[in-house]
Amino acid sequence: MKIYHLYRRQHLNLTIHEAWKFFSSPYNLNDITPEFFHVTIVSRMPKKIYAGLMISYRMKAVFGISMDWLSEISHCDEPKRFVYQQRIGPFNFWSHEVCLTEEQNGILLEDIIFYAMPIGWLGQFINSVLIASKLEQIFDNRHNYLQRKWGD
């Protein structure tokens, strides 16, 4: 199984507590993702995330195909970092770590993503012609939205 990696970092002009409030809420996903990637939260959400929290989504991603996704907050260190991992969904493996580090005049946001495609060589091919570029689009959109909202 081939493991893929995506890493992004960005300086934002807000406090670590403001950043935590924004990034730890799955209700903000549609604000920071492109229109083709619409997310509906299916499960009930508590006021704060915690390690072990399961979140059920329905999303439209590639070609508008609707799919279910179940993720777990596997690690939560408020207000510094959290990790969510796919438990049920389109990938063989998905882990997204969000790290927030206080800096002068704001925070450093780091996104660390590891993922693996299903169906062997065919999944690797689909990743190379479609999925990798879609993920780049999603995180480019996220970067641009955040830059407009809290950028330098």
Predicted regions and their residues:
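Generic structural detector for well-ordered beta-strands
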Residues: 7-11, 40, 58, 72, ...
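Beta-strand/loop substructures that line and gate deep hydrophobic ligand-binding cavities in soluble
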Residues: 86-137
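Short, surface-exposed coil-to-beta transition loops
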Residues: 5-7, 66-70, 92-96
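Hydrophobic ligand-binding cavity/cleft-lining segments
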Residues: 1-50
